[in-house]
Amino acid sequence: MDNTDEPQKKVFKARKTMRASDRQQLEAVYKAKEDLLKTTEVKLLNGKHENGDSDLNSPLSNTDCTEDKREVNGLVDSNEISEIKRPESRAESVVSDLEPKPLSPVNVTREQDTDVALVCEAENRVLGSNKVNFHEENNIKNRLDQRESDTPSGENKSNCDNSFSPEEKGKTNDITIISNSPVEEKKKAGEIIVEDTVGEEAISSSMETDQEPKNERDGTAGLSETVVEKAVDESSESILENTDSMEADEIIPILEKLAPAEDEMSCFSKSALLPVDDTAPDLEEKMDNCLSSPLKQESNESLPKEAFLVLSDEEDPCDEREHAEVILPNKSGLPEEVEKSEEEDKEREVVHKEEEKHTERGEVSRRKRSKSEDMDSVHSKRRRFVGEEDYEAEFQVKITARRDVDQKLEKVIQRVLEEKLAALQCAVFDKTLADLKMRIEKVECNKRHKTVLTELQAKITRLTKRFGAAKEDMKKKQENTPNPSLSSGKAASSTANANNLTYRNITTVRQMLESKRNVGDSKPATLQAPVSAAPASSLAAPQTPASGHPKPQTPVTSSPLTTTVISTANTATVVGTSQVPSGSTQPMSVSLQSLPVILHVPVAVSSQPQLLQGHAGTLVTNQQSGSVEFISVQSSSTVGSLTKTAVSLASTNTTKPNNSPSVSSPGVQRNSPASAGSVRTTLAVQAVSTTHPVAQTTRTSLPTVGTSGLHNSTSSRGPIHMKIPLSAFNSTAPTEPPTITAPRVENQTSRPPTDSSANKRTAEGPTQSVKVTGSDSGGVIDLTLDDEDDVSSQAEAKKQNQTASTAQSIPTQPLSRPLPPLQPNPLQQTGVPTSGPSQTTIHVLPTAPTTVNVTHRPVTQTAAKLPIPRTPTNHQVVYTTIPAPPAQNSVRGAVMPSPSLRPVNPQTGSMTVRMPQTTAYVVNNGLTLGSGAPQLTVHHRPPQVHAEPPRPVHPAPLPEAPQPPRLPPEAANTSLPQKPQLKLARVQSQNGIVLSWSVIEVDRSCASVDSYHLYAYHEDPSATMPSQWKKIGEVKALPLPMACTLTQFVSGSKYYFAVRAKDIYGRFGPFCDPQSTDVISSQSS
């Protein structure tokens, strides 16, 4: 009691922690003690606190309820007397609250309530000491001690768990938030607890609280003791929790100052400090404020001011909230409990005062908190803590208990505060860690996205460069090839092929596509336009004239063809021109016009050029282009153009020897119009017939041509042939032509299956599919026809270089990159009879066969042979041997009758276009090859490479090693230098290639190496000669592995590198396997 008096006299204020609002609240509380008592009306919280029983609000509500009940029951007197009794009942309710609360935020609130109850119990004990409660106080102390252990573990846990919960509750309950003036509320709570021990019970159950307050008031000592004991136990627990959460530093000094009531103060401060206490005060205050300021006022009045310890740590609102949200509330709670314990006697007065203060203060806090904490709602306190808000802990510690009790309480409070603080710190740390993890995850996710974007952009850039380079190469090759083609009729055909090749080469896939687009729009019209017009439009001027008469121009046309491939109209023109040179018939140009359509379909520029060129003069080209293209032709517009073209071609063709096929073609072509394939086929046939009659005779395209009707069928069969071409194509030209023709058409449709597979094999799959006929045909054709002999592909590539030389070359290059893999297929396919066809078989073959078959039945047969024997095929073999292109043709062309073949090629071109395989042959042989070859060539180029020693054609044979003049005797005991293993890598800057070489195992029997000689080979669509291997450097031997970096390359080109060792005796070791790299791409093959 004395102790209580002392604490009443002392008001401790923490400088920092005291909020302005808290001070105001304190002042208001002091001023409005009586008013606070009046606030009993705020029983509204009873409902809340009843609900609050289950939830956070319940503690607050209960507290308020208790207060309300106190006020109702006779706030001041009742509070004083009831405080003793009520503390018991309240403690009981608090106990019940506390027990359930630990599980949930409500637990925290309940803990707070419990703390309050404990305070009440402490007060009750004080009163009990005065009355009978003193004995109870001892019991309470004992229980507090017990509960200290229990509560710390249980409630502290709940505090830890609910470390947010007390504050959350406080926050949740604006009332709790009001706890900002925890001191007031604590005092209030103390008094409320004392008075409203019943009230706390009310917290458990408002009804109970009401009854209990009265009962407890009536049942003084007994209930008090029991309740007080329970309350003390619970308060100990709360206190422990609060102590944990509360900062011991703050609490201890205050407790020490409050030494007289240290025990109760300890309990109280602990509870106050504990989140529970804070929550309890907050809850009580808030509940009081929310339920009824009067209750709080009552509570405050009831609570003696004696040990009004105000820890303004911003327990509720601020600092401690952040760090020890729970702790601060506990702090306030503990002080309250301590207060309550101390205050028992004077708590009534203090409680009244405090209640007033709390009410005012609670109201003020409440406002503050409601605004700040309302956001979080009733749970805002805890959430706030979670939200890292600052908490103010106000501790009103009124210790009315004896010193021994005070000491015990102080210890309990310290322990509880420590535990609570630890819990709060853990919670803060966990939350911070979780936030950090989230941020890290976001950052990593962003990094991944950026990386993916960067990679995609880099790939796009590389592809763009590659296409640009391929385009340039194709243009250069085209320019180069046209000249040769101009050289002679054969040359012209060759040129046409070369042009086609060049065109192809020039037209990288991209160019082809672009051209195609251009052509696509203009193509139908262009095609429809007179063949001459189409050629004219195509490269139009040159081609038209070429188309008109000059086969030499045809080469040009070829180029245009290539161009045409690029643009539909051009394609047509080109084809026409090419064919003119090939067939040396304008019909061819007409075919070309048709071709454009076909070419257009092929989309694959390279194949189109090939097709165009292959068809150069005829629908064949279209067909060839079009296996897929053909389909395009078959498309109504395409058909229309084709039809017109076909007719024109037919007439033109008719004029020409091949005209017979042409004538048939016309009819057929008309049919073709219906089926673009037909027209193309016809054209191709015609062209083939015309030119090929001679050249293609071999082909027997003529038979096909002869079978103009066949052609029609061919066009329709084109697809069939396509499929057949692979097999049939190889098997029978004559039959195939028609088949091919039909297949051709199918080719476009069907050919996707056959040709398309081949085509797809060819790099362009889909595009090629479309252009498969053309593209695959071209490539395949070249390959197939050419490759029909294995080399054929490669040869074909070269042939294409000749025929499609330009066109093919370009396509080859462009395609070559993509196609390399395909080319192998073609090669392999080549191996296979259907290889060509397979190539798509080169759709061209099927198409060509169709066209060629129609035009060149022989060709088809040849094609058939070629596919099977590919090499066996005369033309194909020839083609295989040499790319159709004149230049390459020379090599391969040599095999093929360059002149006739070339002419055939033009025709074949048409035919070739028609039948991918035949075309392939044709292409291989001549322009057709080129036309067909363009794409195929591209596809086949790698095969070509393979054809050459290391690679078909391309890596040309490596130069022979010169023999040293004479060897010293010691050299006889040593073997030649070992064969190095070469690896290529790209420098990130994209402007350098790193060559690194080593040996798998060091052979001791070899003489020491003096130097390494580096050779480079620039892939050229023209004939591949060993002389093309150039020595680029000599490096003094160093311990392996060695490496050097080469720079200054022509972008878009393909380079092959080889290394060989020279020993100290001047002997050269074997070359390493040549390695190639595409300067456009960052990959080395």
Swiss-Prot record:
Q: Which InterPro entries does the record match to this protein?
A: ATF7-int (IPR026085), ATF7IP_BD (IPR031870), Fn3_ATF7IP (IPR056565), FN3_dom (IPR003961), FN3_sf (IPR036116), Ig-like_fold (IPR013783)
Q: Where in the cell is it found?
A: Nucleus
Which molecular function term from Gene Ontology is one that the record holds? transcription coregulator activity
Pfam families linked:
ATF7IP_BD (PF16788), fn3_4 (PF16794)
Q: Composition bias, kind Polar residues: at what positions?
A: 54-64, 151-165, 173-182, 667-717, 746-775, 792-810, 830-843
Q: Which PROSITE patterns match?
A: FN3 (PS50853)
A GO CC annotation recorded here is: nucleus
Key words of the record: Activator, Coiled coil, Nucleus, Repressor, Transcription, Transcription regulation
UniProt main location, coarse: nucleus
**Which superkingdom heads the taxonomic lineage of this protein's source?**
Eukaryota
Biased amino acid composition, Pro residues: 950-968
Kindly list the biological process annotations in GO that this record carries: DNA methylation-dependent constitutive heterochromatin formation; regulation of DNA-templated transcription
Q: Which residues form a coiled coil?
A: 446-480
Q: Where is the composition biased (Low complexity)?
A: 487-499, 529-547, 651-666, 732-743
Record domain Fibronectin type-III: where = 976-1082
What spans are recorded as compositionally biased (Basic and acidic residues)?
82-91, 133-150, 347-379, 469-479
The cross-references to Gene3D superfamilies, in alphabetical order and at most eight, read: Immunoglobulins (2.60.40.10)
Region annotation (Disordered) ranges: 1-22, 47-109, 127-245, 329-381, 469-499, 517-560, 650-843, 889-910, 932-975
Q: What does this protein do?
A: Recruiter that couples transcriptional factors to general transcription apparatus and thereby modulates transcription regulation and chromatin formation. Can both act as an activator or a repressor depending on the context. Mediates MBD1-dependent transcriptional repression, probably by recruiting complexes containing histone methyltransferase activity. May belong to a complex that represses transcription and couples DNA methylation and histone H3 'Lys-9' trimethylation (H3K9me3).
Q: Which family does it belong to?
A: Belongs to the MCAF family.
Protein name, please? Answer: Activating transcription factor 7-interacting protein 1
Originating organism = Gallus gallus (Chicken)
What phylogenetic lineage does the species belong to?
A: Eukaryota, Metazoa, Chordata, Craniata, Vertebrata
Q: Which gene encodes it?
A: ATF7IP
